[in-house]
Amino acid sequence: MSAETVPQKPVLLTGASGALGRILTRALGEAGWTLRLTDRVAFPDPLPEGARFHLADLEDGPAILRLAEGCGTILHFGGISVEHPFETVIGPNIRGLYHAYEAARREGARMVFASSNHTIGFHERSEVLHDDCALKPDGYYGLSKAYGELMGGLYRDKHGVESAFLRIGSCFPEPTDARMLATWLSYADLTRLVMRATLAPSLGPDGTVVIWGASNNSRMTWWGRDGRDTIGWAPQDSADAYAQALEGKTSGNPVVERYQGGGFTGLDYSRRDDSGR
């Protein structure tokens, strides 16, 4: 296998036991990657050849440093993956992220960070956002992902750590509502995105790229310019085939339907005016 398809150094994948971690483990393992997997819960599937799993908590800094030894890339998919109270999010998503970046700094590794569309969730759907848009998180989860992108910028400016920020839309086996006709990211497109973010020779002159993580969906009119050409990624799948079944499947909540973040924007929403942002 060539260096164009397989990284020369091992790759550390955090959050390996989660839904997306399991998908990536299988796909990258089948591609011949040497994987070092970690999560705070046991890995539930058979390990692919070349993969080793280590039970560890992201809040255990020394453990994360040990796991990253010799790795050329860290795929940071660990942490809380949905909205939770701030005190629940802060440990794995803030402190754990810091430990991952410290490991990347020490190893000179590239960071591929599973960011989220919820970093910009309070932009309205009528807006077209580019990769340099203002961050408008729609909850504590999105706030933690926005913080992660800011931390990546700090570690690039101060330590030269490269980062690819993948603003993942809705990554599920298939779309399940009208919003996902725009935001859906297939598992195969996610895998190709992670591969290109890892294998690209450069992340551009700034050393950081933001990628909108959606498949080739004709209804995705909200997300514009990003760094996909820099890494050589083009989504191949599309939610369009599901349009007839899902087009009218909306929440009925005007807040949820106005903003790009969808259901997360409506959680604990208490604004009394209806003027938007």
What label would you give each PLM region?
Residues 11-31:
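N-terminal Rossmann NAD(P)H-binding glycine-rich loop of SDR-like oxidoreductase domains
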Residues 32-44:
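Conserved glycine-rich Rossmann-like NAD(P)H-binding loop of the short-chain dehydrogenase/reductase
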Residues 44, 52-92:
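NAD(P)H-binding glycine-rich loop region in Rossmannoid oxidoreductase-like domains
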Residues 44, 209-210, 216-238, 248-275:
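Conserved C-terminal active-site "lid" loop/helix of NAD(P)H-dependent oxidoreductases
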Residues 59, 88-99, 135, 143-146, ...:
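Glycine-rich NAD(P)-binding loop of the Rossmann-fold in SDR/ketoreductase-type enzymes
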Residues 91, 124-163:
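Catalytic helix-loop patch of NAD(P)-dependent Rossmann-fold dehydrogenases
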Residues 99-138:
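Conserved Rossmann-fold NAD(P)-dependent oxidoreductase catalytic core, especially the SDR/UDP-sugar
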Residues 168-174, 184-207, 216:
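Alpha-helical substrate-binding/gating segment
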